């Protein structure tokens, strides 16, 4: 039996300027998908997401953290890459989303079409921008036991994910997170500030919940046609109601548990469709042994996506069937 193929979609913190640049220039399917969604977004917010992503005055290292651009940009990149793989005959047996990546997973699985999902993302960005104070997220490369060992240091933050045994993420007010970062660096503990302007998955975005819930009540969602394994629950979802699309960015992320669930069912192959390859890196830490042979990413900040795309042919099997 073939190893089931899992498409993974990451969320806020994985984005950067010029992501997917090679594909946008060289791949017709990717570019067409990006431009179609860009036109939809421009009608809603009055400006081009694509022009912001590929702004000639921006460097990859510049923070791409304006939610009105970054929220839709992540979805557009991930869904457009899915269309490229679909065009090559590479289809998923499962989709796995993490945080904002749950929206792309839902679109790919047929819960909603891409245009409607993009509308949900844009509305969420607008409401959060109008309702919430700014915040930050910090990735820490150490054991989560650190939180218990130094309770005073982490008192003004919220644990939002444990991605593997020595990698966890916290959210909080910007001043508090920056102070934690300084203290960790003094202790020679590696950490990285994520390129976000809001403290996703924490109580700091609660002021946006009511307005977004009201918006979601006008939407309808279908049963997934491809199994969804969610980082919200750490398991397989069979039905997605409107509350899911708020909880996906508010509740803690359980990506580690989602991977463990999949691996308890099958020996899987994984393709990271996010812009940074972050989820692929996590999988390689979570799965012992041959994980490097079972997991790959395509788009990375090193702009080798055309080369990486060719290697993904290894994941295509003629026997795999795909139905909607």
Curated annotation (Swiss-Prot):
GO terms for cellular component: cytoplasm. Gene3D superfamilies: Malonyl-Coenzyme A Acyl Carrier Protein, domain 2 (3.40.366.10). InterPro entries: Ac_transferase_dom_sf, Acyl_transferase_dom, Acyl_Trfase/lysoPLipase, Malonyl_transacylase_ACP-bd, Polyketide_Synthase. Its main location: cytoplasm. The active site is at residue 99. Keywords: Acyltransferase, Antibiotic biosynthesis, Cytoplasm, Transferase. It comes from the Bacteria. PANTHER family: POLYKETIDE SYNTHASE 37 (PTHR45681:SF6), POLYKETIDE SYNTHASE 44-RELATED (PTHR45681). This is Polyketide biosynthesis acyltransferase homolog PksD. It comes from Bacillus subtilis (strain 168).
